[in-house]
Every structure is written in structure tokens, then in C-alpha cells.
């Protein structure tokens, strides 16, 4: 616990509010007291150690007694170089926390993602009930994109097609993508802006497919949330690019590289796989990227929260 031994209580609290929240309460209290001790607040640290001691297990008890034996020894001061190292470490960790993609699907901040997954699964159940998700007549009836029908006035197909899937594997792959990316993008944009980007990417990708359809493709059905999910890939890339430029966050730069890799692999896969719409995937990613570039996000660190390593 670098930050605890450096007396940086706020940084330790940030760790316990994030990745280390799973640690037992006595362990967290021990390290917070250690941070206070190293910061020179020996009386506060002693009080916390004394409160922990009666209920501590043998390992924790030994560690507490070791700290108490040094309670009267003043901590060694840090020079400017050491302070910079600690500040850089705290900044890098903060970026990893903020730009990490491991947001929980079951968080209260992922309501839109939960709703979208539920709607996609529900529509797949309806497909199966009416005759099967691989039955073209069923898909057409429920709203698959069919360019002649859309040109005849059935514009609602541009939306409905994004909630239909051809087979369980198609549904599973798209829902995994939504599960992986949705909570982070929703956290960054908020409920309404997230839904706006998701639907813009989906409808926009379907409209692009229809606009450039010709020959045999003009008479084919198109379904799937792939354009929406690729829109989230583009949205994530946009958020990471903005954060990298705004905060010089290396964590955001690395995630941006990951999004570019995903798009590249998707293009490669589409180019060698029949009956897969590269047009929908690429247009969805581009729309998602462009939409987020003009929307506000919630990832910017307020000035009052930037110096998190001060004692």
C-alpha cells in the first residue's frame, strides 16, 4: 500500500471506494490508520489502532502491535522527487479507475443498458414463439429492414430491425458487446444521452445500409443490434480520445487503441464472412464516434478532485 506508507489518506480512501472495496472493514481501517500515522497524525492513528485491536485476528493483531510500537517515532519526510512519484502514481491509478471498462451491468447507473438487453432478449423470444429467429417471414413481419418496404413508407423498420436477431449466436454476440461496453458509456454520458447515441448509431447504420443497397442486396433482410454495439465502440473511442487529449491520460490512450483494434478486427471478420454487413458495422462506429464528440460527458475530473494525494 504505497499511498498508506506515504501518508496519503485521501488516496487510500479512493482505493477503498473502488478496486479495493472488497477488502474486509478491519483491513481497510488498518490501512487508513497507517496512512494517518505516516502523515504525522499519531494520536488519531493510535485511537484507530486501539479500537481495532480487541476484535483483530492474529495476523492483523500482530500488524497493529507493530504499528503501535512505533507510534512515537516521527515519520521521515519525503523530498520533492518522492512526492512527484507518489502524485504520478495516484494520477495514473485515478485514470485507470475512471477509464476502466469494467463497470457493472447491475449498477443503478446502467439502467438503459439493462433495458436494452431485456428488450432484445424479449424480441428474440417473440421471434422464437412466432416460428423461429431464422425464419425470414417472421423477421419481416416483426420489422426487419427491407429496403423496398422502407421506401414504401415503413420507416419504423429502421428502429425495429435493431432489436431483431438471426439466431441465438447473433443475439449472444451482440448482447455480450452491449454488456461489456454499455455500462461504461452510460456512466460517461448519462441515461438519455446514452440512449440517444445507441439509437442514432442503430437507426443511422440501418439507414446507411438501405441508402447504398443495390442489386441482390436491395431485396435482402437486415436485422441486428450490431450497428448499435459498434456505435458504442465508436462512442468509447471518442470518449477515450477526448480524455487523452484533455487530461493526457495514458489509460485512456490504451483504451482508445483497444477500440481501434476492435474496429480493425471487425472489418477483417466482415470481409471474409458472408451475409454480414460491414456497412452497418462501420457506419454505426462512425456515427457513435461523431455523436459523442459533440455531446457532454461526465468523465472530466473537477479541479477540486485533481489533487487526491495530499495529506
Task: List PLM regions with ranges.
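Structural marker of alpha-solenoid helical repeat scaffolds
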Residues: 21-22, 54-55, 59
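Sensory coupling linkers of modular signal transduction proteins
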Residues: 43-44, 60
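Alpha-helical adaptor scaffolds
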Residues: 1-22, 27
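A detector for small-residue-rich transmembrane helices and their helix-helix packing motifs
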Residues: 15, 27, 34-38, 48, ...
Amino acid at each position: 500500500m504505497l499511498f498508506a506508507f506515504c501518508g496519503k489518506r485521501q488516496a487510500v480512501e479512493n482505493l477503498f471506494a473502488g478496486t479495493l472495496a472488497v477488502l474486509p472493514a478491519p483491513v481497510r481501517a488498518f490501512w487508513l490508520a497507517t496512512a494517518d500515522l505516516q502523515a504525522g497524525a499519531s494520536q488519531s492513528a493510535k485511537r484507530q489502532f486501539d479500537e481495532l485491536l480487541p476484535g483483530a485476528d492474529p495476523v492483523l493483531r500482530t500488524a497493529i502491535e507493530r504499528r503501535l510500537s512505533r507510534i512515537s517515532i516521527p515519520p521521515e519526510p519525503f523530498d520533492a522527487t518522492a512526492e512527484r512519484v507518489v502524485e504520478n502514481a495516484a494520477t495514473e491509478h485515478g485514470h485507470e479507475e475512471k477509464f476502466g471498462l469494467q463497470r457493472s451491468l447491475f449498477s443503478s447507473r446502467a439502467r438503459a443498458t439493462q433495458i436494452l438487453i431485456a428488450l432484445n432478449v424479449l424480441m428474440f423470444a417473440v421471434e422464437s414463439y412466432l416460428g423461429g429467429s431464422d425464419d425470414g417471414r417472421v423477421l419481416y413481419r416483426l420489422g426487419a429492414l427491407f429496403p423496398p418496404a422502407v421506401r414504401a413508407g415503413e420507416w419504423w423498420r429502421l428502429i425495429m430491425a435493431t432489436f431483431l436477431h438471426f439466431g441465438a449466436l447473433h443475439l449472444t454476440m451482440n448482447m455480450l458487446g452491449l454488456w461489456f461496453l454499455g455500462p461504461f458509456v452510460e456512466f460517461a454520458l448519462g441515461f438519455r444521452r446514452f440512449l440517444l447515441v445507441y439509437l442514432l448509431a442503430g437507426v443511422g447504420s440501418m439507414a446507411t445500409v438501405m441508402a447504398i443497397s443495390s442489386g441482390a442486396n436491395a431485396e435482402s433482410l437486415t436485422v441486428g443490434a450490431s450497428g448499435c454495439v459498434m456505435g458504442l465502440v465508436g462512442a468509447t473511442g471518442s470518449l477515450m480520445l477526448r480524455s487523452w487529449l484533455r487530461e493526457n491520460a495514458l489509460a485512456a490512450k490504451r483504451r482508445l487503441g483497444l477500440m481501434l483494434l476492435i474496429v480493425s478486427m471487425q472489418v477483417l471478420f466482415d470481409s471474409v464472412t458472408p451475409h454480414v454487413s460491414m456497412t452497418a458495422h462501420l457506419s454505426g462506429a462512425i456515427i457513435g464516434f461523431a455523436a459523442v464528440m459533440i455531446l457532454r460527458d461526465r468523465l472530466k475530473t473537477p479541479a477540486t478532485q485533481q489533487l487526491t494525494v495530499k495529506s
